Amino acid sequence: MFSRYAFRCAQPLRQSARQYSTEAPKSKSLAPVYVAVGLAGLGVGLYRYQSGAATAEAPAERPKVFTGGDQGWVNLKLSDIEILSHNTKRLRFEFPDKEAVSGLHIASALLTKYSPPDGSKPVIRPYTPTSDEDQPGYLELVVKRYPNGPMSEHLHNMNVDQRLDFKGPLPKYPWEANKHKHICLVAGGTGITPMYQLAREIFKNPEDKTKVTLVFGNVSEEDILLKREFEDLENTYPQRFRAFYVLDNPPEGWTGGKGYITKELLKTVLPEPKEENIKIFVCGPPGMYKAISGPKVSPKDQGELTGILKELGYSKDQVYKF
């Protein structure tokens, strides 16, 4: 049912240099001394010139919108709305400084805050932007509307030029290139956004050779968020990225998984627990956490590992719950 691929290797570039030698004159004249001093001065001047040029050419670090700590809330204007499906929108919020970047790192999220007009308690929810952390001028959220979800309903009711409060970044799992040999992303619904953030970071870094397997569960095909982006990764990196989709209500002719993410599916597509340096990330609704890995106790407490991953023999250290 699933195909497997061989992994590519990148070829290193080589550089060469040539050295020159000169023969000192036999004359006892002071001319060589003057020449040496002159050349030394020329060398210093050339070094200073080149150093100055290098400094001038080095790109200045862009200002960051979110700096954490005691910064407080940052109010941003909604500048663009894109309808992705019957219940999902992509919302773009612009930064006051067009040259600024978000200041987020991998993996991290932002808090959003909405104050109801009736003066009731503010609604605060975390969201992981889907725009690149190095993108200047704006950030984007992909938001699915949930019944009785006050923040998602508010975001879907917003119009261009209205404003929303943000705060962050909220640190999650610190990533660095090649931290793990193979990672697996098990996601449900909007739990895909931190997974996409992590996968995008891995594949945009040519030094990072991490393999990535995605298992993504949804109700219907229309609910698969960021599918185009993941298909682009599959087409560009077929030897390092695989995606498996599971639907509760699949359409006729669907060739992916059906129903829920099962123990049999995960046993088939995930690396074995005995493999070295692997990590499994889980993010989704409460029911999925309960079935796959067990819930988190708090943002800082991962809780015990239970569910399917425990039954398959994975250890607590091999699993991270967003």
Curated annotation (Swiss-Prot):
Please state every residue range assigned to the domain named FAD-binding FR-type: 71-176
What topology does it adopt in the membrane?
Single-pass membrane protein
Top class in the EC scheme: oxidoreductase
Q: Does the keyword Cell division apply?
A: no
The entry's FAD-binding residues are: 179-214
Give its E.C. classification number: 1.6.2.2
Q: Which SUPFAM superfamilies match?
A: Ferredoxin reductase-like, C-terminal NADP-linked domain, Riboflavin synthase domain-like
Q: Where is this chain primarily localised? A: mitochondrion
The UniProt entry's sequence similarity note says:
Belongs to the flavoprotein pyridine nucleotide cytochrome reductase family.
What protein am I looking at? NADH-cytochrome b5 reductase 2
Gene encoding this chain?
A: mcr1
